[in-house]
């Protein structure tokens, strides 16, 4: 076993897929070591939600970093969205996913379950851009600085 007592996750991302985020959330939740999340540059969309999964007290954000929170969107792979039952089902599913991930983010930041969902809704569902100070005010970031990390590495490979 490693002597490492915390796992750093460095984030500089325009965001990504909600289902990939779900996989990362499960990995973090099942990890026996605490996770420190560190935003360098930007964390947008799914990356912003991932940032909130750092252990309380271990969420770092660079002074000039930015965070952007937005509702989950969907695409059927073309510029045209098909009307009818498919769209209704997909829209309902997206709303359930939005409430779920924003509920998790709210819990991670010590807020009521609907805190971030309500914030986005109050902004007419527009993208919400925050600087590091604003992230600290909402308890998304715990520190407005990048942590000093010392890395010692050893690799042992054996073939039998």
Model segments located where?
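N-terminal organellar transit peptides
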Residues: 1-46, 53-160
């Amino acid at each position: 076993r490693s002597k490492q007592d915390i796992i750093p996750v460095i984030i500089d991302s325009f965001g990504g897929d909600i289902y990939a985020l779900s996989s990362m959330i499960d990995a973090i939740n099942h990890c026996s070591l605490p996770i420190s999340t560190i935003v360098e540059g930007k964390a947008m969309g799914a990356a912003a939600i991932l940032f909130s999964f750092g252990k309380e007290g271990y969420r770092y954000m660079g002074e000039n970093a930015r965070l952007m929170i937005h509702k989950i969107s969907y695409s059927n792979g073309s510029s045209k969205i098909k009307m009818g039952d498919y769209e209704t089902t997909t829209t309902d599913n997206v709303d359930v996913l939005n409430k779920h991930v924003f509920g998790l983010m709210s819990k991670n930041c010590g807020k009521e379950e609907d805190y971030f969902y309500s914030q986005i809704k109050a902004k007419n569902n527009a993208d919400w851009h925050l600087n590091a100070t604003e992230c600290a005010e909402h308890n998304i970031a715990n520190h407005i600085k990048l942590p000093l990390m010392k890395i010692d590495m050893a690799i042992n490979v054996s073939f039998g």
